[in-house]
Amino acid sequence: MYAVLKSFGLKGLNGFPVEVEADISGGMPALSIVGLPDSAVRESGDRVHAALKNLGFKWPDRRITINLAPADVRKTGPVYDLPLLLAVLAASGQLEPPPKDMAFLGELALDGSLRPVSGVLPMALEAAAGGVRALYVPAENAAEAAEACGSEMQVYPAATARQVVDALRGIQPILPTMPVPFDPADAWNHVPDFADVCGQPLARRAMVIAAAGGHNVLLVGAPGTGKSMLARRLPGILPPLTREEAVETTKIYSIAGQMPAGRGLVTARPFRSPHHSASSAALAGGGALFRPGECSLANCGVLFLDELPEFSRESLEVLRQPLEDGCITVSRAAGSATYPSRFQLVAAMNPCKCGYYGHPTRACTCSPSAVRQYRSRVSGPLLDRIDLCVEMDPVAFDELHTSTPAESSADLRKQVLAARAVQARRYAAPGYEGVRCNAQLTAGQVRRVCRMTPAAERLLRASYDTLGLSARAHDRILRVARTVADLAGKQLLDEEALLEALQYRAQEKVETF
């Protein structure tokens, strides 16, 4: 006898349909799984065998062949356990074959209960696009899968395979899970407040500019000056995630297996802070099963690299593609996968190995050559992709004990949202497809958007000649100046905006001492 069910697999960031075929024929009792399965899929036969018996069903003592189509695409993970069990039941006559517009996902425990699987959202989105009307998933994955529900598809949660069988037989229907209304407003409540940061007015201003324009930041200062404090508070003044960004971010976290059980969409902008010992593979992603790395897990959020020169050169060079293209491609012998990596980079470093070069009260123990060698670990091409560089001085005693409250994240966020609203209106016009903030402007778009006053143009010309700026540095300064002008509500770039942008140049601050 023969039966076929619909399921789904993962390829990169997207799902793809898989037909689970079961054929029971005469011969010696045996189970064969074909269709390019990995070891986890091959082991599913033992799980299905035990689950069937523990649920009170009969295991066919005949030759069973399972085919996972298409056969030329590798199938990974335990997601096919549930459809495999149902296919065996249908092929052995213990269950009527389910309709073709039903699909099934889920890992089996030996007692027949269902365990959550990774990558449910991209598979559910593919199911909805492919005309599936009923998707059965483990109960812990239901909230995530329900975010793919449209006017046609319903998501049905099940704690055990027995519940699915009873629902298909019409004995005990399962109530569908409804999607939770998307509300990212409360995400800010879980981020530390900028009011906790004492002093550092220049660095605080740089973080506002970075948030308003989507710019990358480098913080340089001695230990204890507040570099990490500022970085961890940046997500609290960024605009809320749009639903499109939330879906993309949730897909990444779901594939990586980092979605909390029972959670729907990710509503907070990610903040990732890998240790400086992280390898290039940890940042880029990959592995035998193609999992997203830190660059992709920070998508639509902040990637914070503390102690930047301590990262290996190989790891830092991984950042160049995502910073330039907004995505990262991982290639292995088994194939390649491309993941979105549109993150905002915040890097922090000490001015030297001991950390106290230029400190007003503590002596530096590094020689000039040691300082030069330490700073040279950060390559020029990487510095060329950082828009804002801030040198942070030690916090004075009076700043720690002032009675004047510092601006809170809520106050700074109002400035950022106002500037982002200006940019949203500007880039809604034709010719700015894919541009959401000033940092994403191409060289040609910079010329159109960054119109200057005559005095500002003379200042930029003089700076270009005097400082020996490159074309990329020229455009970077204009992007930052455009953000400064947006924060001030100005149409044209004036001298004040350009001077503020010029003071944040990263290349010279790191390479000179």
Language-model-detected regions and their locations in the chain:
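Conserved alpha-helical scaffold flanking the Walker A/P-loop in AAA+ ATPase domains
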Residues: V208, L265, P270, S280-L303, ...
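Walker B catalytic acidic pair
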Residues: C300, D306-E307, V318
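Walker A/P-loop
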Residues: L219-P260
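Conserved inter-motif catalytic segment of the P-loop NTP-binding fold
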Residues: E245-S279, G286-G287, D393, E433-G444, ...
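Catalytic P-loop NTPase motifs of RecA-like helicase/translocase cores
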Residues: D111, L305-S312, G355
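Peripheral, non-AAA+ core regions of ATP-driven protein-machinery
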Residues: M1-L218, A222, S228, S331, ...
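Basic, amphipathic alpha-helical bundle interface domains used for macromolecular binding and assembly
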Residues: A40-G45, K58-P60, N67-G77, L289-F290, ...
